[in-house]
């Protein structure tokens, strides 16, 4: 079981530099809880991680090989997973944003993202979900 105040976060992104920035940022965010981070390089790996463990939050890229962020989000909701999702993307496509929001996206975060804004969104999203056991 996770220590009190620990939130499990899954980062799903094929760009290792973004994954590293997000992992480092989660370690620096000042909140009442800490973050345990797992990563996946694409939506298919992310789905496999979600099948193995519950998470408090998913940080998700839009465009990835094998399974896009939109496809992963839709599959999560189809399976009844209510985990909050923040979608980080450099895409300005309103249709993608609308589709993601229709599938229960917590927030659409444009790249490059502001770390202070991301900190607020991460805290709100992670706090909106019931705690999970590690």
Where are the language model's segments positioned?
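C-terminal output helix
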Residues: 113-123
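Conserved phosphotransfer cores of two-component systems
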Residues: 29, 51-53, 75-82, 103
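Two-component/phosphorelay signaling modules centered on CheY-like receiver
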Residues: 16-38
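Alpha4 helix (beta4-alpha4-beta5 surface) of REC/receiver domains from two-component response regulators
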Residues: 71, 92-107
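Receiver (REC) domain active-site loop signature in two-component systems and cognate sites
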Residues: 64
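Acidic catalytic/metal-coordinating carboxylates
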Residues: 42-45, 68-71
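Active-site beta3 strand of CheY-like receiver
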Residues: 53-59
């Amino acid at each position: 079981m996770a220590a009190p105040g620990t939130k499990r976060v899954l980062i799903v992104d094929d760009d290792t530099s973004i994954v590293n920035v997000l992992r480092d940022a989660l370690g620096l965010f000042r909140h009442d809880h800490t973050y345990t981070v797992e990563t996946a390089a694409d939506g298919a790996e992310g789905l496999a991680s979600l099948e193995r463990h519950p998470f408090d939050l998913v940080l998700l890229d839009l465009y990835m090989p094998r399974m896009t962020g939109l496809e992963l989000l839709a599959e999560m909701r189809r399976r009844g997973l209510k985990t909050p999702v923040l979608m980080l993307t450099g895409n300005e496509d309103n249709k993608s944003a609308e589709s993601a929001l229709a599938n229960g996206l917590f927030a659409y975060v444009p790249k490059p993202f502001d770390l202070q804004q991301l900190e607020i969104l991460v805290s709100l999203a992670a706090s909106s979900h019931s705690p999970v056991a590690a």
